């Protein structure tokens, strides 16, 4: 592992993790680590008129599109909470952006995100927080009668998946861009 934009060095802790002394600054490095599993991931699935289709088979097709983005989080630690061992995930926010031309995509709807139009294109921003719902375990939280919070509604907003629907003509899609951050 080589620092490519500074002089900061790292040490290896008892668990084999690299620890950088960066004083809050970003570190830019290159190299290969023994454990190459990424902390987060994503998968996009497509349905056209209710039938699941592969990305290569949907190109050029028309119909009712349902695109599902499923984010995943492999970064977790086991901690003790109220005397019980629980898996707590690193709280990542993941956001995906895509540009969908108005001449191919119409009636776009998204359950976790926003659709913005600039005339020729719809800009879709989707978000998810993989692992956060499991870490908070809101289904098993009793807030009492004095707290007026719908935990099911809150749980729906901190989901790890996004569903985008649209009427599509001659399907084609350029790149999607996804960013994950635990630094909010």
Tell where the protein language model's regions lie, with residue ranges:
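Cytosol-facing boundaries of transmembrane alpha helices in integral membrane proteins
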Residues: 1-184
């Amino acid at each position: 592992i080589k620092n490519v934009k500074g002089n900061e060095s790292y040490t290896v802790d008892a668990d084999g993790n690299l620890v950088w002394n960066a004083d809050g600054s970003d570190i830019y490095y290159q190299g290969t680590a023994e454990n190459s599993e990424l902390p987060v991931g994503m998968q996009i699935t497509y349905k056209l008129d209710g039938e699941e289709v592969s990305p290569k088979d949907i190109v050029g097709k028309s119909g009712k599109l349902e695109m599902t983005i499923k984010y995943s989080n492999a970064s977790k630690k086991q901690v003790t909470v109220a005397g019980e061992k629980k898996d707590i995930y690193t709280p990542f926010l993941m956001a995906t952006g895509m540009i969908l031309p108005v001449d191919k995509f119409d009636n776009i709807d998204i359950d976790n995100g926003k659709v913005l139009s600039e005339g020729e294109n719809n800009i879709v921003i989707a978000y998810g927080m993989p692992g956060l719902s499991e870490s908070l375990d809101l289904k098993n939280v009793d807030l009492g009668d004095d707290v007026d919070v719908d935990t099911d509604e809150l749980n729906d907003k901190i989901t790890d998946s996004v569903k985008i629907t649209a009427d599509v003509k001659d399907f084609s899609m350029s790149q999607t861009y996804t960013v994950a951050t635990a630094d909010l």
